[in-house]
Amino acid sequence: MNSSARTRRDLPESPYLAAVNGRKPHRVPVWFMRQAGRSLPEYRALRAQHDMLSACFDAELVCEITLQPVRRHDVDAAILFSDIVVPLLGAGIDLDIVAGVGPVIASPVRTAADVAAMKPLERQRVQPIADAVRLLVSALVEVPLIGFAGAPFTLASYLIEGGPSRHHARTKAMMLADPDSWHALMEKLTDITVGFLRVQLDAGVDAVQVFDSWAGALSLANYRSYVQPHSARVFAALADYGVPMTHFGVGTAELLGAMSAALKPAPATVVGVDWRTALADAATRVMPGTALQGNLDPVVLLAGWPVVETAARAVVDDGRRAVDAGAAGHVFNLGHGVLPETDPGVLTELVSLVHSL
């Protein structure tokens, strides 16, 4: 076992850690992807003074932004404020985050020579993230902290496309036309992802979530051939830390079993489910002993409280059916991130409702 696993916080009262470890929590745990973000006025006030990348590398700012939704909403977990491309910066990739666009890569990676020129993650470059984790572990007291990283496929898509993409056409074309370069790229990105998560785990995060945001663009056959082995290596490399690990993607109903299998070496495994798939159905698709996370449609939060309440109750009921169907536990979340236009008061009320059910 990794030495850091022996010194990790003991949080026996955490509903989140109970649910993901297959124990019965004293209340339904709830947190939200992108809970620290543009829906919060206090976040917008801070970001008015800092661009996204500088915010991600300022330990005290990362700490404050991560804590904001915990204070406001009483969620059962904090997730480290970061961006999916931060580890790419740690590996020397020239990129920027452009308002209204997202990450933009200065020199996309599209050839064998481009792949060969890529450098490994330098831990010193991401030292502020470790510093932020240490601050947060001290400040959160009884609330677990979830570490954060993008999965190799999603990082590959940003690198190959040069930024966000609707169809991931260049990515899939390279994958199919030049599998040698593809797998070489995925090996390097796997090492970067593992290194970035090790930085967070060594600093004390209590769990990790790996976001494969764009994996839903793939068929099951292509996912298994070109992606799953690399994602599986991420989780296998981190298994000795002894922390729960979550694997999440959007539009991945047909991939849930394979995404669950990639998690297999982890001591406690969680698969995130989006709103398109019923949790009880997802429970039959994942590996035995897997907990589920999700899956309220983020748009529901814009539809008024009566709609939110009805939908939230349905998700909690579906989560209980999922546990009856074999899921190890259920963590209430959205099926994707909080939308910027979401009323934070609705989120606070939603947390209170879920805790009461």
From Swiss-Prot:
Substrate binds at residues 34-38, 83, 158, 213, 336. Its main location: cytoplasm. Pathway: Porphyrin-containing compound metabolism; protoporphyrin-IX biosynthesis; coproporphyrinogen-III from 5-aminolevulinate: step 4/4. The keyword NADP does not apply. CDD domains: URO-D. The keyword Lyase applies. The record marks 83 as: Transition state stabilizer. InterPro entries: UROD/MetE-like_sf, Uroporphyrinogen_deCO2ase_HemE, Uroporphyrinogen_deCOase. It is found in: Cytoplasm. GO terms for molecular function: uroporphyrinogen decarboxylase activity. It catalyses: uroporphyrinogen III + 4 H(+) = coproporphyrinogen III + 4 CO2. Signal peptide: none annotated. Homodimer. PANTHER family: METHYLTETRAHYDROFOLATE:HOMOCYSTEINE METHYLTRANSFERASE RELATED, UROPORPHYRINOGEN DECARBOXYLASE. This is Uroporphyrinogen decarboxylase. It comes from Mycolicibacterium paratuberculosis (strain ATCC BAA-968 / K-10) (Mycobacterium paratuberculosis).
